Amino acid sequence: MTTVAQKHFLEGQTYSVPLIQPDLRREEAVQQVADALQYLQKVSGDIFNRISQRVETSRAQLQAISERVTLAQAKIEKIKGSKKAIKVFSSAKYPAPERLQEYCSIFAGAEDPSKQKWPRHKIQSKHRMLDEKSLQEKLKYFPVCVNTKIHQEDDAEEGLGSLPRNISSLSSLLLFNTTENLYKKYVFLDPLAGAVTKTHVALETETEEKLFDAPLSITERGQLDRQVAENYFYVPDLGQVPEIDVPSYLPDLPGIAADLMYSADLGPGIAPSAPSSAIPELPTFSTESVEPSQADLQDPGLLPPPPPPPPPPPPVMPTTVPPPPPLPQPTAPSEPARTASEDSSKTVPAASVQGAPKEVVNPSTGRASLLESIRQAGGIGKANLRSVKERKLEKKKQKEQEQVRATGQGGDLMSDLFNKLVLRRKGISGKGPGASANPDAPGSPAGAFARMSDSIPPLPPPQQPPGEEDEDDWES
């Protein structure tokens, strides 16, 4: 009967070819060699079959990729010479499966042929006798390492020695209430105090412990350099771009589209952009030029006075001209001066522009249209303006009325006291009701001041040229 050598398996190893042992009988060695060669043939055949299947699978995948490349190349060749703009849509996701296929080993599912039942052979020859001489010859070629070193016992024993035979439990082996094995390492330890474990050698050689040396930053008065944190963020840079002086448009170029202005349904955008409805659409205005009337070109002295015109419609203003600000209301003495200036302004252009073109006589500029709109609005005479002095007097009267109401509505002690103090101050200053009731009394200071002010003649009003009044005193 043949014996097969023991096989040693590795991690992930599927096949294992047996080795033939030496010093076998001839018939036994021949049988083991035949069985090993037969096993090796089966293993090699299985390995090459699996490699061929994997190569065929990879070749099919490569063929599919080649077909896709050929199809894409044909599409590129078809549109290569076209001059029309082509819209290309890109997929939002990468064209790959969500879950990648895991790698499968080429030997997945393989079975070891050695697990099959081998035939049994009956050997007729007998074993040879052991020969010491042949064994000594083999030791020359097959070195045998034998550890002949004698283990020397340790002189310094730390524990109590070997374990006694009468120990029957773990509690009798360890020191009470601790995890120390005294037979292995003898320690001086109080089981109830929980002190630090110290051997008798450490107790004998124990010395005073010193503090560690100070670090170099303290002893040498050195300062550590602050490390600058490295920035690993991606900062794109345009880099060096060469300057090329070429025209902006080159017609009839091969492979360049000429009809870039095309309309197509783009659909919803990918990036979050601002909605187009946020920009308001401005209305369109029709700009009408203000044509001068023929009456302005004629002499106003030869024409009869025109009838009162109807109320004019709102003037059509250009989009760029702002509305005119209101002008101050003139006083009565400035009316004749204004009419005289208007008559002179009408007569002077009529006399100086004889034979001039229409555009020169009446320029249609923004300033002329602004003056025309002011004339149509009525000018200074129709403006509803009010003097600032009148407004100040009204505010003063309103303030006095509020104070009188406050004095009449007082109900508590503090308000009555406050009102009396106010009346006393007014009486002292000559502004109270007592002073105004009897201004001619000899002891009243208000009456004396009033008589002195009456004796002083009023100042004449300042003479101002017409049209140069202070505009700060007028408010709409």
From Swiss-Prot:
InterPro entries: WASH1, WASH1_WAHD, WH2_dom. The keyword Membrane applies. Keywords: Actin-binding, Endosome, Membrane, Protein transport, Transport. Residues 284-296 have a biased composition (Polar residues). It holds the Pfam family WASH_WAHD. Residues 273-412, 427-476 are annotated as: Disordered. Residues 467-476 have a biased composition (Acidic residues). GO terms for cellular component: cytosol; early endosome; early endosome membrane; recycling endosome; recycling endosome membrane; WASH complex. Residues 366-388 form the WH2 domain. Residues 302-333 have a biased composition (Pro residues). Residues 1-54 are annotated as: Required for WASH complex assembly. One of its GO terms (biological process) is retrograde transport, endosome to Golgi. GO terms for molecular function: actin binding; alpha-tubulin binding; gamma-tubulin binding. PROSITE patterns: WH2 (PS51082). Component of the WASH complex. The VCA (verprolin, cofilin, acidic) domain promotes actin polymerization by the Arp2/3 complex in vitro. Belongs to the WASH1 family. This is WASH complex subunit 1.
